[in-house]
Amino acid sequence: MVLLLFLAAVPLAAAPPPALKDRFLDNFVGDWSVVRKMGNGRTIESSVRGEWVLRHQFIQLHYGAGEKEPEYEALVFIGFDETAKNYVCHSVDVFGGRYSGLGRGKLDPNLLGIEFRFDSKKGSLTNRVGFDPETKIWTSLIRQEENGQWKTLAEEKWTRK
């Protein structure tokens, strides 16, 4: 019992790291209109608000932010793991804990995109997010592995409101 209390207190005793400075993630800050085209052809439109949270350690993306009754709602947190030298993505949505996930990915050499990989017992999922600095548009390609084959689950296009 004492050991558990000690282990729980260790993170509290350490000072938090300095605010994360990341020019790539800074591009998420703001309000966005998102068009999501599902693999079955269905289209969903929603709003996303991006902001720095948790002492500037994560970008929070709130799908459905400001909508009265959003068709889809999710909270996505993206941060950087300094030890592993990769980005982390925590995703939770209206489909519940069964579908929540932790993905990891590296920023491409041109500083324009990250492909996050989420692994589970049912297979893998990737989400390749990219930013075009000229048009200021985000894109996202979400693919899912089913029976050894990769299929497009959804494609998104984000434009600033």
Language-model features and meaning:
Residues 5-14:
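Hydrophobic h-region of N-terminal signal peptides that target proteins for export
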Residues 14-161:
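Hydrophobic small-molecule pocket/channel-lining residues, especially in calycin-type beta-barrels
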Residues 1-3:
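Bacterial N-terminal signal peptides that target proteins for export
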